[in-house]
């Protein structure tokens, strides 16, 4: 029967695409800040028979029978999340960070309520109030942003905007902001205007788990995150909150916006959270930051302008206007030499979102492969050779050769 055959036997077209993707991930430098490589254990959990099990509800209160073992899995994930982040309650069921944000909004807001979020072009996220997203359609969105001179969040201006508009909820967090976020300052602003504070820590969850970035948990009414990126787990979402909001959050997730949870993904989340509790995880996170700073410095030495002047995290935002390139062109040029980045808007960007004036770079994936500061200098050289000499084939070939050497010296997970 079909169900007892291998993937290669059943669907060679899909099997080939997966095989090619394995090759791509191993042969290219992954510098997209939101991407990482999970462990073999996480892959095994996500590819397990738990994908067969429906489990609407929560541990001990399911709408289906036969949930005794998935209850164990989800309970372990919840316990580990609470231990790592010091939270009173954790919901590990959101299928994504976007759905975690949606559930948080629905737990505390009504349609038409005012939310404040970081402007998308200044480093915010679609789900923080962008007009093209559900968050900008269902709620009245008021943006805050960064100072043009420094590229850093203007907290005084943020406070003034909050006093003017009196939002019901302020959203902190970003998808393209390289500096540490001041959650204590955000809490003070929220308290002054009587607003709830929601922090989306998706990009920096791993750094926070390792104690390398201020934790939002003591300051926020609700914290959302993805479970991949720096946390190095499966693609998914999670919500943390004080115990007093547990019932509202759980109800907003199920039955509010989701039905059955993805138990195989929750198992993978549990495994990744277990990995995050080990001493080597902190060492890994420390190396992510060291690598980001080394790469930032090496890029600056080669004439690249960095938004906010550098980085405190895993992420670097490069403004390419002084190079005469758009983000879209740079992304394509780098892909040709086997370096993967994403085009990204920079603050006060004159280019449209599909073009942009910048690229976003992150170090989590290359750090997972074991690369350190010396490799970051080589990566900066590759970027410089590629973007400063786009029409010179010999230079491009040299850049591609450096990438091949780096990838060979730091092998991808063997599957």
UniProtKB/Swiss-Prot annotation:
Cofactor(s) the record lists: pyridoxal 5'-phosphate
Binding site for (6S)-5,6,7,8-tetrahydrofolate: 120, 124-126
EC number per UniProt: 2.1.2.1
Pathway(s) the chain acts in: One-carbon metabolism; tetrahydrofolate interconversion; Amino-acid biosynthesis; glycine biosynthesis; glycine from L-serine: step 1/1
Transmembrane annotation, as ranges: none
InterPro entries: PyrdxlP-dep_Trfase (IPR015424), PyrdxlP-dep_Trfase_major (IPR015421), PyrdxlP-dep_Trfase_small (IPR015422), Ser_HO-MeTrfase (IPR001085), Ser_HO-MeTrfase-like (IPR049943), Ser_HO-MeTrfase_PLP_BS (IPR019798), SHMT-like_dom (IPR039429)
Record-marked site positions (Plays an important role in substrate specificity): 228
PROSITE patterns associated with the record: SHMT
The UniProt record lists the keyword Cytoplasm: yes
GO CC terms in record: cytosol
The reaction(s) this protein catalyses: (6R)-5,10-methylene-5,6,7,8-tetrahydrofolate + glycine + H2O = (6S)-5,6,7,8-tetrahydrofolate + L-serine
GO biological process: glycine biosynthetic process from serine; tetrahydrofolate interconversion
Xref: Pfam families: SHMT
Localization (cell): Cytoplasm
Keywords: Amino-acid biosynthesis, Cytoplasm, One-carbon metabolism, Pyridoxal phosphate, Transferase
Residues carrying N6-(pyridoxal phosphate)lysine: 229
The protein's assembly and partners: Homodimer.
NCBIfam families: PRK00011.1
Role according to the record: Catalyzes the reversible interconversion of serine and glycine with tetrahydrofolate (THF) serving as the one-carbon carrier. This reaction serves as the major source of one-carbon groups required for the biosynthesis of purines, thymidylate, methionine, and other important biomolecules. Also exhibits THF-independent aldolase activity toward beta-hydroxyamino acids, producing glycine and aldehydes, via a retro-aldol mechanism.
Protein name: Serine hydroxymethyltransferase
Lineage: Bacteria, Bacillati, Bacillota, Clostridia, Thermoanaerobacterales
Name of encoding gene: glyA
